[in-house]
Regions:
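N-terminal binding-site loop/beta-alpha segment at the start of enzyme catalytic domains
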Residues: 1-76
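Short, acidic/polar
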Residues: 29-41, 100-117, 162-171
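Active-site groove signature of glycoside hydrolases
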Residues: 114-133
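Beta/alpha (TIM)-barrel catalytic core signal, keyed to glycine-rich beta->alpha loops juxtaposed to Asp/Glu
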Residues: 57, 129-323
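A short, structured active-site edge motif that brings together acidic residues
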Residues: 74-87
Protein backbone atom coordinates (compact mmCIF):
# COMPACT_ATOMS: atom_id res chain seq x y z
CA UNK A 1 0.00 0.00 0.00
CA UNK A 2 1.35 3.40 -1.00
CA UNK A 3 0.73 6.46 1.17
CA UNK A 4 0.24 10.16 0.48
CA UNK A 5 0.42 13.25 2.71
CA UNK A 6 -2.93 14.46 4.06
CA UNK A 7 -2.47 18.14 3.35
CA UNK A 8 -0.87 20.19 6.09
CA UNK A 9 -1.23 17.47 8.68
CA UNK A 10 1.90 15.44 9.29
CA UNK A 11 0.05 12.23 8.45
CA UNK A 12 0.94 9.80 5.70
CA UNK A 13 -2.37 8.12 4.86
CA UNK A 14 -3.01 5.04 2.75
CA UNK A 15 -4.05 5.75 -0.84
CA UNK A 16 -7.02 3.47 -0.26
CA UNK A 17 -8.83 4.36 2.92
CA UNK A 18 -12.00 2.83 4.32
CA UNK A 19 -15.45 4.43 4.00
CA UNK A 20 -17.74 3.11 6.73
CA UNK A 21 -21.20 4.29 5.74
CA UNK A 22 -22.15 0.89 4.36
CA UNK A 23 -21.35 -0.76 7.69
CA UNK A 24 -24.43 0.77 9.29
CA UNK A 25 -26.58 2.47 6.69
CA UNK A 26 -27.13 -0.05 3.90
CA UNK A 27 -29.05 -3.32 3.78
CA UNK A 28 -27.08 -6.44 4.53
CA UNK A 29 -24.86 -4.82 7.14
CA UNK A 30 -23.38 -7.47 9.41
CA UNK A 31 -21.04 -6.62 12.29
CA UNK A 32 -19.10 -9.88 12.11
CA UNK A 33 -18.44 -9.41 8.41
CA UNK A 34 -17.60 -5.74 8.95
CA UNK A 35 -15.06 -6.53 11.66
CA UNK A 36 -13.42 -9.17 9.49
CA UNK A 37 -13.16 -6.73 6.59
CA UNK A 38 -11.72 -3.98 8.78
CA UNK A 39 -9.07 -6.26 10.24
CA UNK A 40 -8.19 -7.48 6.75
CA UNK A 41 -7.84 -3.93 5.47
CA UNK A 42 -5.36 -3.10 8.22
CA UNK A 43 -3.35 -6.21 7.41
CA UNK A 44 -3.16 -4.96 3.82
CA UNK A 45 -1.91 -1.52 4.79
CA UNK A 46 -5.05 0.59 5.10
CA UNK A 47 -4.59 3.18 7.86
CA UNK A 48 -7.31 5.79 7.25
CA UNK A 49 -10.92 5.20 8.29
CA UNK A 50 -13.86 7.53 7.73
CA UNK A 51 -17.04 7.17 9.75
CA UNK A 52 -19.75 9.45 11.20
CA UNK A 53 -22.19 9.63 14.07
CA UNK A 54 -24.90 9.55 11.41
CA UNK A 55 -23.89 6.05 10.32
CA UNK A 56 -26.19 4.09 12.58
CA UNK A 57 -26.33 6.80 15.28
CA UNK A 58 -22.82 6.01 16.42
CA UNK A 59 -22.82 2.29 15.67
CA UNK A 60 -20.24 2.58 12.90
CA UNK A 61 -18.05 4.66 15.23
CA UNK A 62 -18.27 1.98 17.91
CA UNK A 63 -17.21 -0.74 15.46
CA UNK A 64 -14.26 1.34 14.30
CA UNK A 65 -13.14 2.21 17.81
CA UNK A 66 -13.13 -1.45 18.77
CA UNK A 67 -10.92 -2.33 15.80
CA UNK A 68 -8.50 0.55 16.37
CA UNK A 69 -8.08 -0.40 20.03
CA UNK A 70 -7.26 -3.96 18.98
CA UNK A 71 -4.47 -2.61 16.75
CA UNK A 72 -2.91 -0.27 19.29
CA UNK A 73 0.53 -1.11 17.93
CA UNK A 74 -0.28 0.49 14.56
CA UNK A 75 -0.68 4.12 13.50
CA UNK A 76 -4.29 4.35 12.34
CA UNK A 77 -6.16 7.56 11.57
CA UNK A 78 -9.79 8.01 12.54
CA UNK A 79 -12.07 10.53 10.84
CA UNK A 80 -15.66 11.10 11.87
CA UNK A 81 -18.37 13.71 11.30
CA UNK A 82 -20.75 15.88 13.29
CA UNK A 83 -24.37 15.57 12.10
CA UNK A 84 -26.28 18.78 11.46
CA UNK A 85 -28.54 19.68 14.38
CA UNK A 86 -31.64 19.56 12.17
CA UNK A 87 -30.55 16.12 10.87
CA UNK A 88 -31.16 17.15 7.28
CA UNK A 89 -28.77 15.88 4.62
CA UNK A 90 -27.66 17.75 2.63
CA UNK A 91 -27.93 21.28 3.95
CA UNK A 92 -29.69 23.81 1.75
CA UNK A 93 -28.83 27.39 0.92
CA UNK A 94 -30.62 29.47 3.52
CA UNK A 95 -30.03 27.05 6.38
CA UNK A 96 -28.42 28.93 9.26
CA UNK A 97 -25.50 27.90 11.42
CA UNK A 98 -27.92 27.82 14.37
CA UNK A 99 -30.01 25.24 12.54
CA UNK A 100 -27.04 23.02 11.75
CA UNK A 101 -23.93 23.66 13.84
CA UNK A 102 -24.40 25.93 16.86
CA UNK A 103 -21.34 25.77 19.14
CA UNK A 104 -22.98 23.68 21.85
CA UNK A 105 -24.05 21.12 19.24
CA UNK A 106 -20.51 20.88 17.86
CA UNK A 107 -19.15 20.12 21.32
CA UNK A 108 -21.97 17.73 22.22
CA UNK A 109 -21.41 15.54 19.17
CA UNK A 110 -17.64 15.71 19.35
CA UNK A 111 -17.94 14.28 22.85
CA UNK A 112 -20.52 11.69 21.76
CA UNK A 113 -18.28 10.52 18.93
CA UNK A 114 -15.28 10.37 21.24
CA UNK A 115 -17.27 8.20 23.64
CA UNK A 116 -18.50 5.92 20.85
CA UNK A 117 -14.97 5.49 19.54
CA UNK A 118 -13.48 4.89 22.96
CA UNK A 119 -10.26 6.59 21.89
CA UNK A 120 -8.21 9.38 23.52
CA UNK A 121 -8.88 11.80 20.66
CA UNK A 122 -10.45 12.18 17.21
CA UNK A 123 -7.85 12.58 14.48
CA UNK A 124 -10.14 14.37 12.02
CA UNK A 125 -13.51 15.87 12.94
CA UNK A 126 -15.59 16.95 9.94
CA UNK A 127 -18.81 18.86 9.45
CA UNK A 128 -21.17 16.40 7.74
CA UNK A 129 -22.85 19.11 5.64
CA UNK A 130 -21.78 22.64 4.81
CA UNK A 131 -22.89 26.00 3.46
CA UNK A 132 -20.18 28.44 2.43
CA UNK A 133 -22.32 31.30 3.76
CA UNK A 134 -21.16 30.21 7.24
CA UNK A 135 -17.48 30.78 6.41
CA UNK A 136 -16.98 33.95 8.45
CA UNK A 137 -19.12 32.97 11.46
CA UNK A 138 -16.73 33.00 14.40
CA UNK A 139 -18.86 30.64 16.48
CA UNK A 140 -17.95 27.45 14.61
CA UNK A 141 -14.39 28.70 14.33
CA UNK A 142 -14.05 29.13 18.10
CA UNK A 143 -15.80 25.83 18.84
CA UNK A 144 -13.38 23.88 16.66
CA UNK A 145 -10.37 25.81 17.93
CA UNK A 146 -11.36 24.97 21.51
CA UNK A 147 -11.67 21.26 20.68
CA UNK A 148 -8.22 21.35 19.11
CA UNK A 149 -6.67 23.20 22.05
CA UNK A 150 -8.16 20.70 24.48
CA UNK A 151 -6.71 17.77 22.57
CA UNK A 152 -10.10 16.30 21.69
CA UNK A 153 -9.60 16.91 17.96
CA UNK A 154 -6.36 17.00 15.97
CA UNK A 155 -7.60 18.29 12.60
CA UNK A 156 -10.76 19.88 11.19
CA UNK A 157 -12.50 19.01 7.94
CA UNK A 158 -15.62 19.55 5.87
CA UNK A 159 -17.58 16.93 3.97
CA UNK A 160 -18.94 18.87 0.99
CA UNK A 161 -22.53 18.37 -0.11
CA UNK A 162 -23.17 16.13 -3.10
CA UNK A 163 -22.47 17.86 -6.43
CA UNK A 164 -21.57 21.16 -4.74
CA UNK A 165 -17.75 21.18 -4.79
CA UNK A 166 -17.59 24.97 -4.82
CA UNK A 167 -19.82 25.36 -1.75
CA UNK A 168 -16.77 25.46 0.53
CA UNK A 169 -14.23 27.70 -1.22
CA UNK A 170 -14.65 30.77 1.01
CA UNK A 171 -14.42 28.60 4.10
CA UNK A 172 -11.17 27.02 2.97
CA UNK A 173 -9.69 30.49 2.58
CA UNK A 174 -10.15 31.12 6.32
CA UNK A 175 -7.14 28.87 6.89
CA UNK A 176 -9.03 26.91 9.55
CA UNK A 177 -9.81 23.80 7.51
CA UNK A 178 -7.19 21.06 7.26
CA UNK A 179 -9.03 18.55 5.07
CA UNK A 180 -11.93 18.55 2.62
CA UNK A 181 -13.97 15.51 1.64
CA UNK A 182 -15.69 15.58 -1.73
CA UNK A 183 -17.37 13.31 -4.26
CA UNK A 184 -14.83 12.69 -7.01
CA UNK A 185 -15.00 9.95 -9.62
CA UNK A 186 -14.93 9.39 -13.38
CA UNK A 187 -18.35 11.02 -13.69
CA UNK A 188 -17.96 13.71 -11.01
CA UNK A 189 -14.92 15.62 -12.27
CA UNK A 190 -16.03 19.12 -11.23
CA UNK A 191 -13.76 19.30 -8.13
CA UNK A 192 -10.85 19.70 -10.55
CA UNK A 193 -12.17 23.05 -11.76
CA UNK A 194 -11.75 25.20 -8.64
CA UNK A 195 -11.66 23.07 -5.47
CA UNK A 196 -8.51 21.05 -6.15
CA UNK A 197 -6.41 24.02 -7.28
CA UNK A 198 -7.36 25.88 -4.08
CA UNK A 199 -6.59 22.83 -1.93
CA UNK A 200 -3.20 22.56 -3.59
CA UNK A 201 -2.51 26.26 -3.00
CA UNK A 202 -3.49 26.08 0.68
CA UNK A 203 -2.04 22.61 1.35
CA UNK A 204 -5.43 21.15 2.31
CA UNK A 205 -5.84 17.38 2.28
CA UNK A 206 -8.40 15.86 -0.10
CA UNK A 207 -10.51 12.80 0.68
CA UNK A 208 -12.22 11.43 -2.43
CA UNK A 209 -15.52 9.80 -1.55
CA UNK A 210 -18.10 7.90 -3.62
CA UNK A 211 -15.45 6.55 -6.04
CA UNK A 212 -17.98 4.14 -7.54
CA UNK A 213 -20.85 6.65 -7.83
CA UNK A 214 -22.86 4.78 -5.17
CA UNK A 215 -22.43 1.56 -7.16
CA UNK A 216 -22.79 2.69 -10.75
CA UNK A 217 -19.05 2.37 -11.39
CA UNK A 218 -18.94 -1.18 -10.12
CA UNK A 219 -20.55 -2.11 -13.43
CA UNK A 220 -22.99 -4.43 -11.69
CA UNK A 221 -26.17 -2.33 -11.77
CA UNK A 222 -28.92 -2.93 -14.27
CA UNK A 223 -32.07 -0.99 -15.00
CA UNK A 224 -33.93 -3.67 -13.05
CA UNK A 225 -31.81 -3.38 -9.88
CA UNK A 226 -33.81 -2.94 -6.66
CA UNK A 227 -33.06 -2.50 -2.96
CA UNK A 228 -35.05 -3.00 0.26
CA UNK A 229 -36.95 0.07 1.44
CA UNK A 230 -34.59 0.28 4.43
CA UNK A 231 -31.58 0.66 2.13
CA UNK A 232 -30.61 4.25 1.30
CA UNK A 233 -30.02 3.31 -2.32
CA UNK A 234 -33.73 2.63 -2.78
CA UNK A 235 -34.37 6.38 -2.51
CA UNK A 236 -31.28 7.42 -4.47
CA UNK A 237 -31.64 5.14 -7.48
CA UNK A 238 -35.11 6.27 -8.48
CA UNK A 239 -35.96 5.18 -12.05
CA UNK A 240 -34.81 8.50 -13.49
CA UNK A 241 -31.38 8.15 -11.87
CA UNK A 242 -30.96 4.39 -12.22
CA UNK A 243 -31.61 4.34 -15.95
CA UNK A 244 -29.28 7.24 -16.66
CA UNK A 245 -26.58 5.81 -14.37
CA UNK A 246 -26.62 2.43 -16.08
CA UNK A 247 -26.41 4.11 -19.49
CA UNK A 248 -23.35 6.09 -18.40
CA UNK A 249 -21.66 2.98 -17.00
CA UNK A 250 -22.30 1.01 -20.18
CA UNK A 251 -20.83 3.83 -22.28
CA UNK A 252 -17.66 3.50 -20.22
CA UNK A 253 -17.33 -0.26 -20.58
CA UNK A 254 -15.53 -0.31 -23.97
CA UNK A 255 -12.67 1.72 -22.48
CA UNK A 256 -11.85 -0.74 -19.68
CA UNK A 257 -8.41 -2.25 -20.38
CA UNK A 258 -8.17 -6.01 -20.79
CA UNK A 259 -7.78 -7.75 -17.45
CA UNK A 260 -9.10 -4.78 -15.49
CA UNK A 261 -12.47 -4.43 -13.77
CA UNK A 262 -14.60 -1.29 -13.80
CA UNK A 263 -14.04 -0.68 -10.05
CA UNK A 264 -10.28 -0.94 -10.58
CA UNK A 265 -10.47 1.55 -13.43
CA UNK A 266 -12.53 3.89 -11.25
CA UNK A 267 -9.97 3.83 -8.43
CA UNK A 268 -6.95 4.15 -10.72
CA UNK A 269 -8.53 7.15 -12.42
CA UNK A 270 -8.84 8.94 -9.06
CA UNK A 271 -5.30 8.03 -8.01
CA UNK A 272 -4.04 9.64 -11.22
CA UNK A 273 -4.71 13.02 -9.58
CA UNK A 274 -1.87 13.69 -7.15
CA UNK A 275 -3.98 16.22 -5.25
CA UNK A 276 -6.10 13.39 -3.85
CA UNK A 277 -4.71 12.22 -0.51
CA UNK A 278 -6.87 9.13 -0.05
CA UNK A 279 -9.94 7.42 -1.50
CA UNK A 280 -12.59 5.98 0.83
CA UNK A 281 -14.58 3.25 -0.94
CA UNK A 282 -17.16 1.42 1.11
CA UNK A 283 -15.95 -2.13 1.71
CA UNK A 284 -18.18 -4.50 3.65
CA UNK A 285 -16.85 -7.73 2.19
CA UNK A 286 -13.34 -9.14 2.47
CA UNK A 287 -13.10 -9.73 -1.28
CA UNK A 288 -13.79 -6.05 -1.95
CA UNK A 289 -11.17 -5.02 0.60
CA UNK A 290 -8.60 -7.19 -1.14
CA UNK A 291 -9.52 -5.99 -4.63
CA UNK A 292 -9.61 -2.30 -3.74
CA UNK A 293 -6.43 -2.19 -1.67
CA UNK A 294 -4.55 -4.03 -4.44
CA UNK A 295 -5.03 -0.99 -6.68
CA UNK A 296 -2.47 0.93 -4.62
CA UNK A 297 0.51 -0.55 -6.46
CA UNK A 298 2.06 2.48 -8.11
CA UNK A 299 0.89 1.52 -11.61
CA UNK A 300 -0.57 4.44 -13.54
CA UNK A 301 -3.25 4.44 -16.21
CA UNK A 302 -2.18 5.16 -19.78
CA UNK A 303 -2.22 8.89 -20.54
CA UNK A 304 -4.29 8.30 -23.64
CA UNK A 305 -6.93 6.50 -21.59
CA UNK A 306 -6.98 9.30 -19.02
CA UNK A 307 -7.62 11.75 -21.83
CA UNK A 308 -10.49 9.63 -23.16
CA UNK A 309 -12.05 9.39 -19.70
CA UNK A 310 -12.33 13.18 -19.48
CA UNK A 311 -15.19 12.89 -21.96
CA UNK A 312 -17.18 10.85 -19.43
CA UNK A 313 -17.60 13.80 -17.11
CA UNK A 314 -21.23 13.97 -16.02
CA UNK A 315 -22.20 17.23 -14.34
CA UNK A 316 -25.29 16.95 -12.17
CA UNK A 317 -27.17 19.29 -9.85
CA UNK A 318 -28.78 18.38 -6.52
CA UNK A 319 -32.36 17.14 -6.71
CA UNK A 320 -34.97 15.81 -4.31
CA UNK A 321 -33.50 12.29 -4.50
CA UNK A 322 -29.79 13.14 -4.41
CA UNK A 323 -29.45 13.53 -0.62
Amino acid sequence: MFTRPLGRTSWQVSEIGYGMWGLAGWSGSDDTESLDSLHRSIALGCNFFDTAWGYGKGHSESILGRVVREHADKTLYVATKIPPKNFKWPSRKGFTLDECFPPEHIREYAEKSLENLGLPHIDLLQFHVWEDDWASDERWQRAMADLKEQGIVRAVGISVNRWEPDNVLKTLKTGLIDVVQVIFNIFDQAPRDRLFPLCEELNIGVIARVPFDEGTLTGTLTKESTWPSTDWRSTYFVPENLESSVDHAEALRPLIPSGMTMPELALRWILADSRVSTIIPGMRKRRNVEANTAVSDGKALDLGLLQQLKAHRWDRTPTAWSQ
